[in-house]
UniProtKB/Swiss-Prot annotation:
<dbReference type="InterPro" id="IPR011323">
    <property type="entry name" value="Mss4/transl-control_tumour"/>
</dbReference>
<dbReference type="InterPro" id="IPR011057">
    <property type="entry name" value="Mss4-like_sf"/>
</dbReference>
<dbReference type="InterPro" id="IPR018103">
    <property type="entry name" value="Translation_control_tumour_CS"/>
</dbReference>
<dbReference type="GO" id="GO:0005737">
    <property type="term" value="C:cytoplasm"/>
</dbReference>
<comment type="similarity">
    <text>Belongs to the TCTP family.</text>
</comment>
<comment type="function">
    <text>Involved in calcium binding and microtubule stabilization.</text>
</comment>
<keyword id="KW-0106">Calcium</keyword>
<dbReference type="InterPro" id="IPR018105">
    <property type="entry name" value="Translational_control_tumour_p"/>
</dbReference>
<protein>
    <recommendedName>
        <fullName>Translationally-controlled tumor protein homolog</fullName>
    </recommendedName>
</protein>
<dbReference type="Pfam" id="PF00838">
    <property type="entry name" value="TCTP"/>
</dbReference>
<dbReference type="GO" id="GO:0005509">
    <property type="term" value="F:calcium ion binding"/>
</dbReference>
<dbReference type="InterPro" id="IPR034737">
    <property type="entry name" value="TCTP"/>
</dbReference>
<feature type="domain" description="TCTP">
    <location>
        <begin position="1"/>
        <end position="173"/>
    </location>
</feature>
<keyword id="KW-0963">Cytoplasm</keyword>
Length: 173
């Protein structure tokens, strides 16, 4: 199994168990589905069951959302277009520092930066219609997943989550 992790935070963003594609060697796109599923009982540390009220059976709730967001425990955040542009400046610099730290050559760093710039140019015009997600750690310095709803053949919309390829580390499990 392949695991795609945020290079900067180590957060797990997605695995190859989902249907994904690489667009123009710069953006991973994952088609998601809305799901509703049961949530198991949560035991609180330090709770004394004998002191609690006796329950008849187990209460199970449900959670709804996008399968990828729920499975990877992504955390929704918000950006204005200006805030997102400012984030991109900081993020690009942090990525370049990380690439150099990891021993990438100047040519490899320039190629990765070029691909990242290409990816940004593709998504920036549509940024006002997108939702944003951080990894499980909610670290604002890491990669931000972009969610966009696209028209599909049946007349509805398909949720598509996008990640910049060069902000992810591909790890074999």
């Amino acid at each position: 199994m392949l695991l795609f992790k945020d290079i900067l935070t180590g957060d797990e963003m997605f695995t190859d168990s989902v249907k994904y594609k690489l667009v123009d060697d710069c953006i991973f796109e994952i088609e998601c589905e809305h799901v509703t599923r049961k949530v198991g009982e949560v035991a609180l540390d330090g709770a004394n069951p004998s002191a609690e009220e006796v329950e008849e059976g187990t209460e199970e709730g449900t959670e709804s959302g996008l399968d990828l967001v729920l499975n990877m425990r992504l955390v929704e955040t918000g950006f204005s277009k200006t805030d997102y542009k400012n984030y991109l400046k900081t993020y690009t610099k942090a990525l370049m520092d990380k690439w150099k730290e990891d021993g990438k050559s100047e040519a490899e760093v320039n190629e990765a930066k070029s691909k990242l710039t290409e990816a940004v140019k593709k998504v920036l015009p549509r940024i006002g219609d997108m939702q944003f997600f951080l990894g499980e750690s909610s670290n604002p310095d890491g990669i931000v997943a972009l969610l966009e709803y696209r028209p599909n053949k049946s007349g509805g919309e398909t949720p598509v989550v996008m990640f910049f390829k060069h902000g992810l580390l591909e790890e074999k499990q």
